[in-house]
Amino acid sequence: MDVITTHVNADFDCLGAMVAASKLYPDALMVFSGSQEKSMRDLFLKTTGYALPFTRLRDVDFSDITRLVLVDCQHTSRIGRFAEVARRPGVEVHIYDHHPGSSGDIRPSGGEIRDCGSSTTILTRKLMEQGIEVTAVEATLMMLGIYEDTGNLTFPSTTPEDYAAASWLLERGANLNIVSDFVSQELTAEQVALLNDLLKSLRSTPVNGVDIAVAHATLDHYVGDIAVLAHMMRDMQNLDAIFLVVGMGERVYLVARSRIAEVDAGAVMRVFGGGGHATAAAATVRDQTVIQVLGRLNRLLPELVNPVRTAADLMSSPVITLPLATTITEAREILTRYNVNAMPVMDGERMAGIISRRIVEKALYHGLGNLPVDEYMHTEFLRAAPDTPINAIQDYIVGQHRRLVPVFSGERLVGVITRTDLLRYMYTGTQRNAEPVYDLGSENLPVRRREVVHLMNRHLPRPTVAMLRDLGKVGDELELPVYAVGGFVRDLLLGAENDDIDVSVEGDGILFAETVANRVGCRVKSHAKFGTAVIVFPDGLKVDVASTRLEYYETPGALPTVERSSLKMDLYRRDFTINTLAVKLNAEGFGTLIDYFGAYRDLQEKTIRVLHNLSFVEDPTRVFRAIRFEQRLGFPISRHTENLIKNAVKMGFLDKLGGRRLLNELVLILREREPVKAILRMSGLGLLRFIHPDLVLAPNTLQVLDEVKKVITWFDLLYLGEKVETWVVYFLALTSSLPDEGFWGTCTRLSVSEHYREKLIDMRVHGEQVLEVMTRKAARREDVRRSDIYFWLRGLSPEVLLYIMAKTRSDEVRRYVSLYVTQLRGIVTHITGDDLKTLGIPSGPRYREILDRVLTARLNGEAATRDDEMRIAVRLADSA
């Protein structure tokens, strides 16, 4: 195993060099040997758009390391636990360091140590020489290393190679805006004076609902790095957008910085002949005064600043409503069912008012449950339109303590904005303004929306990406928002393969699927009751399509009732936060990741977390799903979620779980790559008793389960091309300690179909009987012929054969089964019943008896040819 590491208290040069080294050693793990500098920690805290592929120190098996790659370090005293690895005989050590005068105590067998501004430069040159490309994200991280160790390419130690490396990285998309935000710079006296002048002139003006800050100054000499001042003023004053206009000699310099999508700094600067990104840009104007440039800027801003976000951007649709005649008691049930705190009340098609949970609870307290909601609903409310600015809605909800704002198109109710919607919007805005959150893969986006097109292009086959774009185009034609959702998106972010593509449509999912089928010429199977469909493409790829919907549960453990809903409500009904991500597929915004519930954070923290505290009460099968995801992904269940599981077990909610649903979850667990770990977790949480009251994970049962994995691996390596239902083998092993009555009871509890129940019982009974016979023979060391083995095991399925091998403690019995599977199972006689017929033997049971006797001879080496078999058949016929 290869490992890339660096010195303790790592800095940006360490980070950049490690990233570069990972391109030269693509199979290596990147591991920090210890702590990092504060600037590094800040980077990891603020960077949410890209999962940096580092392995935790505690997850490394040091005994497996065969090659150690050290960057920016040559001393064992600075690499923590990796020192013993570097000293271990047989370990190959490569060092890349830019301190040639610092001879260390490690004798490298490879790498490069030479004088230049940064270790990252050395490795960047290697990539340039070998023609190895890097992504924009990698280029940015590497540029951070070069800039930090060369003082933004100004230290005396800086070499032409550092400039060349920086140029190469810039050509590959290195983002200098991010670099400048993380590499600290000291202000000169001239910059401090200019900063003071700019702060005095700073004015903020609303433009299209957006506050735009503009500051200006005039100098008779040149002062460099105005961009640094723009960053400082933006942070000091907590500004969304700022424009600096500074006259120096015969030129006017403009610098723009923006944190919000409504202001595209690059677009504004391009009008002045400059350029840049949406978040950072600059321009230089000749032959004009500062006053002239300010005037032109003020005239341009209303044209170039996009209007602030409106109600249409924030509202949830379709709307869940209450009829006017709904009673207070019924209203409480409906508010609880949909997990909302306020709901519009409708008089036919007209909205008559709003009822809140607080009013409902108070009315019930006073014994008014039988009265209709129109007696106590709010009848005065803001009537927002789709184009109502968010700040007006914010003033209403916050200023008047309202829970809900309805949105109307004319007189038709088209959506609602809840207090939660507004808080989430305000939270993302505050997070963005107070402290930048960086998406290294794109531009400084809000916390809960990110661009993941680069991940789609990196991890998905090209035909799949093209297909997803085509789905978005069909959505555009039908004016339907279309999203990839769930586990497919989760695994996309994790870089894991997942061919199960789920698509949610805000609207008629069946119409969407049928339209796709007509466009592409593929098959579609619809389920009108649930609003779902499956699209089967000509190449065999399947896409599951569903109308966005919500679910509610009449009683704990019951099957859900389904209704049409919005994307947000559709995602809220899911089991865990990590499965609530969506990626937009429509052309406008293709590849935008939507995260309502902090799923991205939980993916980064590797945590399984439910969305609400009643999740396991509503659907106890989620308990088993939590364990399955925990073991598959290696993500621990959060402490709070585990406490909720224990509560569901204690309160007996799993007793109400239907057998078929429990069986489905158990089968999925037993089909996992490491089901024994999940079974151990189930045992630890007291879940096995819900399968059968007497089912426990005794030591002998655990031993059988461990053996199952070994025998399945053995069988797979035979390459027989035979499919084995591995879950059946694990199921037989899990229940091996139960008596026959207990096994039958388990099948009944799990509502196994009558046909399959008989099949499982037959497997169990015959398997145990054969195992007992073979064990007895082996224990007595009786002479066992090949034919004995054949007839003992003939007719048993591969699942039963593997179960026998796993359960037996006898090596001799394992040899019997192995011999049968590898040599005996396929042996048949040369002669058939037709040959017996030519001998004049009447058809009937005698045929099977003779053919079995002939087969016995063949198995035992007493009949090698067809003629040998015919002679035996004739002899048996004559003796009859």
From Swiss-Prot:
Entry-linked CDD domains: CBS_pair_DHH_polyA_Pol_assoc (cd17772), NT_ClassII-CCAase (cd05398)
Biological process per Gene Ontology, one example term: tRNA processing
Role description: tRNA nucleotidyltransferase involved in the synthesis of the tRNA CCA terminus. Adds the terminal adenosine residue to tRNA.
Listed SUPFAM superfamilies: CBS-domain pair, DHH phosphoesterases, Nucleotidyltransferase, Poly A polymerase C-terminal region-like
Domain of life: Bacteria
Stored SMART domains: CBS (SM00116)
Family: Belongs to the tRNA nucleotidyltransferase/poly(A) polymerase family.
Protein name: A-adding tRNA nucleotidyltransferase
Cofactor: Mg(2+)
Catalyzed reactions: a tRNA with a 3' CC end + ATP = a tRNA with a 3' CCA end + diphosphate
GO molecular function: ATP binding; ATP:3'-cytidine-cytidine-tRNA adenylyltransferase activity; metal ion binding; tRNA binding
UniProt keyword list: ATP-binding, CBS domain, Magnesium, Metal-binding, Nucleotide-binding, Nucleotidyltransferase, Repeat, RNA-binding, Transferase, tRNA processing, tRNA-binding
Annotated binding of Mg(2+), by residue: 500, 502
Chain ranges of the CBS domain: 315-373, 377-435
Enzyme Commission code: 2.7.7.-
Coiled coil, from the record: none
Binding site for ATP: 487-490, 574-575, 579, 619-628, 632, 661
